[in-house]
């Protein structure tokens, strides 16, 4: 109930105010003070030279003549996807390590940018433009005319929100973290609006579209607009379950419980029948929830990665509930993955190898036949066929699947009693998992750190104010925003975040 939630929240606040700094007594080759000076130097540059009203793109020319999100952007824009909320989390990690208020202020500025850009429906798009929607529509117009092989999700202006690439999820979770840290209601309100959005956009079956509010106008040839399909790709279904769980567990939002349970049973409903007992990246809203297409290089078909992800989810749901219905058809999914795996001769033909315990599978297999589908393009269009020669390079036609680890986890669960399985359940367990969930929420992905890596970063930051990166190939086409030459290196928020993560990991190991 809410009383328990309030108790939990009080304990979380206590945890949040307890800053763990292990560097003081640890034996290290590099003084902690040197690392902290470098962290602050790199952060000040990002906040004072790079930030736009608290928000960030991905890459910038060293002279700031050009800037990019996933694609080239206007200076008035900031990126949500892998951008502003991710930077905010790095600032909070640094704040909770060092106690330096500068990092908290940087995180608050990022949060303010996200609050400014929250859609009226409660979610977020891929990017924001502080110059307004007219300016953003002009950007889309240039992208449509200027990019040949652009990221197709940016080829049409919808004016709505997206779950793709965790844009809405990352924003909502970062603002939830801000609220738990500060208890400032200015951060709770947008989290509640985000929860409203997640609940409103959920289909009765329990899944979510890629975008919401729903639009259907972007039809290409004989392919309907895919953004209304139930989406598993890029973690949409998993992320929304995680967000509902966080709201229920950390905020005591009981209205999240029934939608969460529906989302769990939706995974069962979407699984194909034998011999194709897998999942697709998108499922249509027809009677069979059949696989649906997405971008031109994402055909309708069953997908190995989606299947592995849903198997892990089902095992997680079993831990939460102790209900064996979540385990019942996992062996069918394993059988499906085994049936589409490449043998050694085929992997040699493809020039691929895998690690021990992994299998190599096609990214997509054809509905009804299990034949691998391969992805191609030329300057004018994409196509899909059965020929593994001449494949596109920006999106792989094959995927490595950790099948053995899935099987091991499944067998381990079978060996446990129901009481053992559910001991950490957020619903029926005897253990308060809020601290574990909060830790996951707080830390994010941490980089492995060693003395050599840290020393290399420190050397760079003695010469520069930033950690340089390279412009990714998808960003190199010029849709006409600038005639300035492409830089040999860029100011990269990815390199900044990786570097900060390395420093933090080193100081806390």
Predicted regions and their residues:
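Terminal, non-catalytic domain-edge segments
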Residues: 4, 25-45, 109, 149-156, ...
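Short N-terminal amphipathic alpha-helix/helix-capping patch enriched in small hydrophobics
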Residues: 12, 39-42, 83
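Bacterial N-terminal signal peptides
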Residues: 14-20
């Amino acid at each position: 109930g809410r009383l328990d939630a309030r108790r939990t929240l009080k304990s979380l606040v206590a945890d949040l105010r307890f800053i763990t700094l292990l560097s003081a007594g640890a034996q290290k080759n590099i003084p902690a003070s040197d690392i902290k000076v470098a962290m602050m130097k790199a952060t000040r540059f990002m906040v004072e030279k790079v930030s736009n009203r608290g928000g960030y793109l991905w890459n910038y020319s060293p002279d700031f003549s050009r800037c990019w999100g996933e694609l080239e952007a206007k200076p008035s824009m900031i990126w949500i996807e892998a951008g502003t909320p991710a930077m905010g989390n790095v600032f909070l990690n640094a704040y909770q390590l060092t106690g330096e208020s500068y990092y908290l202020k940087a995180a608050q500025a990022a949060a303010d940018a996200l609050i400014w850009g929250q859609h009226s429906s409660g979610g977020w798009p891929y990017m924001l433009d502080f110059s307004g929607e007219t300016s953003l529509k002009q950007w889309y117009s240039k992208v449509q005319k200027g990019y040949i092989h652009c990221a197709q999700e940016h080829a049409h202006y919808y004016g709505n929100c997206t779950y793709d690439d965790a844009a809405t999820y990352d924003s909502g979770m970062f603002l939830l973290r801000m609220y738990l840290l500060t208890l400032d209601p200015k951060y709770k309100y947008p989290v509640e609006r985000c929860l409203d959005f997640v609940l409103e956009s959920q289909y009765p079956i329990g899944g979510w579209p890629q975008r919401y509010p729903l639009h259907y106008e972007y039809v290409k040839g004989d392919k309907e607009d895919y953004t209304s399909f139930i989406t598993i790709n890029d973690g949409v279904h998993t992320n929304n379950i995680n967000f509902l769980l966080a709201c229920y567990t950390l905020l005591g939002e009981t209205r999240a419980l029934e939608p969460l349970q529906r989302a769990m049973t939706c995974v069962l409903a979407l699984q194909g029948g034998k011999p194709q007992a897998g999942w697709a990246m998108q499922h249509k809203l027809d009677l069979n929830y059949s696989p649906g297409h997405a971008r031109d290089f994402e055909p309708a078909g069953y997908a190995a990665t989606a299947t592995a992800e849903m198997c892990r989810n089902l095992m997680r749901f079993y831990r939460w509930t102790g209900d064996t219905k979540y385990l019942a058809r996992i062996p069918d999914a394993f059988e499906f993955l085994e049936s589409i795996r490449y043998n050694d001769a085929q992997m040699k033909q493809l020039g691929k190898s895998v690690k021990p315990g992994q299998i190599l599978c096609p990214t997509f297999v054809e509905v009804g036949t299990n034949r691998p589908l391969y992805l191609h393009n030329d300057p004018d269009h994409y196509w899909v066929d059965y020929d593994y020669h001449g494949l596109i390079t920006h999106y792989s036609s094959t995927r490595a699947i950790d099948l053995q680890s899935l099987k091991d986890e499944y067998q381990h669960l079978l060996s446990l009693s129901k009481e053992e399985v559910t001991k950490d359940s957020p619903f029926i367990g005897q253990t308060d998992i809020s601290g574990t969930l909060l830790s996951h929420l707080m830390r994010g992905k941490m980089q492995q750190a060693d003395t050599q890596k840290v020393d290399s970063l420190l050397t760079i930051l003695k010469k520069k104010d930033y950690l340089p990166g390279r412009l990714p190939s998808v960003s190199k086409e010029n849709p006409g925003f600038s005639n300035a030459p492409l830089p040999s290196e860029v100011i990269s928020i990815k390199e900044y975040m990786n570097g900060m993560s390395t420093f933090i990991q080193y100081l806390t190991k």
